[in-house]
Amino acid sequence: MTIKKRLSAALAVGVLVLAACSTGSDTSGGGDDGGGGDDGGQAAAPKKAEDIRIDVVTHASPGDSFWDVVKSGAQRAGTDLGIEVQYNNDPDPGKQSILIDNAMADNTDGLVVSMANPDGLESSIKSAVDNGIPVITINSGIDDWQDFGAITHVGQGEKIAGETAGEQLNDAGVKNVICVIQEAGNVALEDRCAGAKKTFNGSMENLQADNTDLQASQATIQSKLEDGSVDGILALGGDMSGAAVRAVNAAGRDVVVGTFDVNADVAQNVLNGKLAFAIDQQPYVQGYLGVTGVYLNIINGNDVGGGQPVYSGPAVITKENAKEVALFAKNGTR
């Protein structure tokens, strides 16, 4: 029930955001009519949509299909709102912080930032906030967005999502699982494994892999499968789940594989039974609502979320509901 309530709240916020977009556009358009008279002490009229640029800066690695969906959501929001959206990414926190600083120097109107390594981005994000630039964090960073001065965070509670995965593994009847972390130092991924360990009734060991080298990661996973007691794998990303499935096939083992995050291949693998489940945080929602929330703050002073995060997940994808998800995944929106 807790997960359903969180998802219902997230959908409710999303509906309010989209409804507010229409109101915000009307307010922006009407601002020109109220500029005269004796109200010289009022703040300047809000910017018109066509004059707004929002920069999305993520920690995505090159070729990561998950972030292609986030980018698509952000760009669709830009199209729907009639604003410019710039997208840049770098998995190195030092370089990501430079991208944030560069956006500020180039007079961005707002920022949407993922925080896989909050400590590495703290200075840049706080500097943006101090300079009056509205910031919303997405995906990673749910424990730090308030301290950094962001409006809200759009994503899932990673520990809660991990707990959900642990329960799914219990339902699958496995006893000895490896949790594959594909990005070193990513606090969200560490939280997923920690959450899964909390609810999983068996034993679980973390395994470090590399999402930028899936072939090597497959070999790393396959080597762990030489231990005959390992009967489950929890992948933390869609691309890594593919490497896990291939490792199981190559090892000739009967091993249950579950994953976080959804793409077209993941949806198909759930349908054909190669994956037992997928935990979906809906990355398209993160990109779309991140941009929309910043836009609303710029044109109408709205603070989306009311001081709380906006939950985009977790949702559980199984064979029972994967067919519908697969249709959207083929479009690059799930």
Model-derived features with residue positions:
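Extracytoplasmic "Venus flytrap"
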Residues: 41-81, 86-102, 115-118, 181-191, ...
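Secretory targeting and sorting signals
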Residues: 1-25
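Hydrophobic alpha-helical segments within soluble ligand-binding/sensing domains
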Residues: 96, 152-177, 215-218, 263-266, ...
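Hydrophobic alpha-helical
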Residues: 97, 113-130, 196, 211-268
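Flexible loop/hinge segments that line or gate small-molecule binding clefts
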Residues: 119, 123-160, 263-271, 275-276, ...
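Hinge/cleft segment of the Venus flytrap/periplasmic-binding protein
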Residues: 12, 43-46, 50, 199-202, ...
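Short, solvent-exposed amphipathic alpha-helices that sit
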Residues: 65-80, 161-165, 187-204, 243, ...
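Bacterial lipoprotein signal-peptidase II cleavage site
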Residues: 21-42
